[in-house]
Amino acid sequence: MPNTSFPVPSKFPLGPPAAVCGSGETLRPAPPSGGTMKAAEEEHYSYVSPSVTSTLPLPTAHSALPAACHDLQTSTPGISAVPSANHPPSYGGAVDSGPSGYFLSSGNTRPNGAPTLESPRIEITSYLGLHHGSGQFFHDVEVEDVLPSCKRSPSTATLHLPSLEAYRDPSCLSPASSLSSRSCNSEASSYESNYSYPYASPQTSPWQSPCVSPKTTDPEEGFPRSLGACHLLGSPRHSPSTSPRASITEESWLGARGSRPTSPCNKRKYSLNGRQPSCSPHHSPTPSPHGSPRVSVTEDTWLGNTTQYTSSAIVAAINALTTDSTLDLGDGVPIKSRKTALEHAPSVALKVEPAGEDLGTTPPTSDFPPEEYTFQHLRKGAFCEQYLSVPQASYQWAKPKSLSPTSYMSPSLPALDWQLPSHSGPYELRIEVQPKSHHRAHYETEGSRGAVKASAGGHPIVQLHGYLENEPLTLQLFIGTADDRLLRPHAFYQVHRITGKTVSTTSHEIILSNTKVLEIPLLPENNMRAIIDCAGILKLRNSDIELRKGETDIGRKNTRVRLVFRVHIPQPNGRTLSLQVASNPIECSQRSAQELPLVEKQSTDSYPVIGGKKMVLSGHNFLQDSKVIFVEKAPDGHHVWEMEAKTDRDLCKPNSLVVEIPPFRNQRITSPAQVSFYVCNGKRKRSQYQRFTYLPANGNSVFLTLSSESELRGGFY
């Protein structure tokens, strides 16, 4: 193997050779060389012998760099890297003042008394005057003040290393771009080691470093010298290879560490004698004098990008694009190392608004973390602290009360899928004005299409009758199904809160069991009457809803909904009376509203089993060949009875249809029988099911049938 020599920075003093930690080659006696002794003046200028076979230049370190960044601290020292096969692998270093057995005879000596090292090699004399005591190992050397140039004594150390290929990252273009030469860290580098660059950790570095791990410096010494060294943080040079490892977590700090040598640059802060301080993922108390230009790199950002970028220019561009714009606003301490507070983190000012009069004075924002804020008390504003102040309404929304475990807790309110009556005792919840039969619902990606309107203009009106108290109540509104099954919240449609200049009703939006519920106040001064001009209909994505368990039974083709209103009335005995009423069906699809028949009103909803009476249906999209089908279903949904009613085609209009009620299948029933009917314009063009009740037959049923037929012939229709 050819000898390879290259200069590397060194602060090693003159002394006997010593083996240090690492996996390299130990020193061996230098073979005789026929070269002559070079003068000390030539060594100061890094004179290179012409007999050098292979050289690998490395950048020399600046004398102002701290010892924490690199342990070899002379400006232009010379170290010869000579592979050796006679000694076990380890890092070793020999100095010029070692035993004579390592060098030539005493005749070939330098002016300073040191013998000539072997050739071919590169030999550079240090400018820095380093003094040492009796210690013979590198980690026992103490760095003293730099002497003037006239008093500096030359010192040369020899470091034998194994083959250079073992320390080179195959994807790196030069040793300067290795993972271990990313930056120079000060004593506050633990901030960036924990958060910014997980691949810079010495315990997780995949490539070994050709340099010996440096000695830890004292905080008093390392901090001032790091002022000039930390300018390297802004260097545009970055490693062309990315790291496949995840970020440093609490578990990785507590886990076992490997035994292989680690990279320098003060990443592992303990000396070469094996004394290892306790590693902690917590922040270092000493701040960094310069802000870090890097951003946090997490596991999510590294996965999938481990082999894509192999050029340092691409990595530099990515880092420039992802650099936090708020880094220059700080005081020099990296963003990741600062204490999390409201004045540092957010880019939008957050103002705390009292939720009610009983909230009291708001404590300072620095006394509690942001996660203690509630969503209702946060308002976004600009840095200029200007926003539109909206006057608070007289109606205060109910706040959740914190109850102790020993306090009495009343039963919870009924679920949204419970079937509740519309009247009970003196109370009745009634829809005074029904909504329009068609309303175009809007999607989440488009703008609102306004509030639901009434058929005759305006908006729906709901009123609670029989309530004589002076306390206001809350009217709840949600979107329910409009099929023939039991009423329940619709999975594909939600209520949408409408705001604007033309909205006169105050509303508040909450979520109950994945269903949006709009709360509207019912005030005694308004006779417990509310105009619903603040409710729209929102269409959710089918893919999002169908992933939920138990929601696919509704079907994406079910585009008809109802407005469901609820009110909870407290009783003197401590209980709560809940009433519910649902509106007429509302078609939310524009295409369905133009093609499917829709029944809005029927002239009668019950008749005796003998049938024969004329019934008028009002709605939309009725045709001359429209059919009306009466159906009786079993509890399991199976059709027990199905009959087509006769239609009067002469009286048929697009918005009205006259049919004859067919006789029921069982003429001897003793209790009312519930059936349904629908209008059909084709195979797949059916209206929603409408309810109808058959009554038991008696002596007056025949008279009622005959009288109704005579009224029809008299010209009522």
Curated annotation (Swiss-Prot):
A motif (Nuclear export signal) lies at residues 312-323. Induction: Induced in T-lymphocytes upon activation of the T-cell receptor (TCR) complex. Induced after addition of phorbol 12-myristate 13-acetate (PMA). Induced by calcium in pre-osteoblasts and osteoblasts. Expressed during osteoclastogenesis, its induction and activation is regulated by TNFSF11/RANKL. This is Nuclear factor of activated T-cells, cytoplasmic 1. Rel Similarity Domain (RSD) allows DNA-binding and cooperative interactions with AP1 factors. The N-terminal transactivation domain (TAD-A) binds to and is activated by Cbp/p300. The dephosphorylated form contains two unmasked nuclear localization signals (NLS), which allow translocation of the protein to the nucleus. GO terms for biological process: aortic valve development; aortic valve morphogenesis; B-1a B cell differentiation; branching involved in lymph vessel morphogenesis; calcineurin-NFAT signaling cascade; calcium ion transport; cellular response to calcium ion; endocardial cushion development. The modification Phosphoserine is found at S235, S239, S247, S271, S296. Residues 205-300 are annotated as: 3 X SP repeats. Pfam families: RHD_dimer (PF16179), RHD_DNA_bind (PF00554). Residues 411-593 form the RHD domain.
